């Protein structure tokens, strides 16, 4: 309940309508709470530096607060990569081999992975749908592209300095696996920090702004 009123008058109660159902908020929160320890055991805490994992976690407060800015920020940051993940995954599932050649979803078909880890990794299928639904309900905040660019510029160097090339988190050591060797690591990182906003964030921004901006 929110209190509103006019000058010189007592405030009156005004009902605040929640735009997102608890039937979405509660199951999603439970899903993330179960996923976190499974991922921690299987891949370690560094795995949560993936931009998709950052978005997965950030959507918990975004859902409960119905926060348009945070939702928009996560959508502009991961929507296109998540769609690419789904394309790679379903093509591999149907054909049985890596069609795209980036080995982005190979881990989903490795027998040594914990079955629960593979199951919860299917959040990549659900996450873009959730993001688009929330943007549809809340609208798109055009400031998101600037904030997400700053986040990317902070997160990518952290991944480069604090994680192993073997993990190649956020592909800071090369596109796909194995890591690239054609230029020096720092130069490649700099190129990636410029390319990600240009080829991922800005196109997603224009698409979301055209489709969902209410201003």
Where does each model-flagged region fall?
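Alpha-helical transmembrane segments in multipass membrane proteins, preferentially the mid-helix core
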Residues: 121-144
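Short, hydrophobic transmembrane alpha-helix segments
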Residues: 37-46
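Short aromatic-rich membrane-water interface segments that cap or initiate transmembrane helices
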Residues: 105-119, 181-189
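N-terminal membrane topogenic signal
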Residues: 12-27
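Interfacial segments of alpha-helical transmembrane regions
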Residues: 62-81, 139-152
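Membrane-interface transmembrane-helix boundary segments in multi-pass integral membrane proteins
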Residues: 159-201
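A basic- and aromatic-enriched beta-loop-alpha substructure that forms the phosphate/nucleotide-
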Residues: 75-114
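Aromatic-anchored segments of alpha-helical transmembrane domains
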Residues: 30-37, 79-88, 151-163
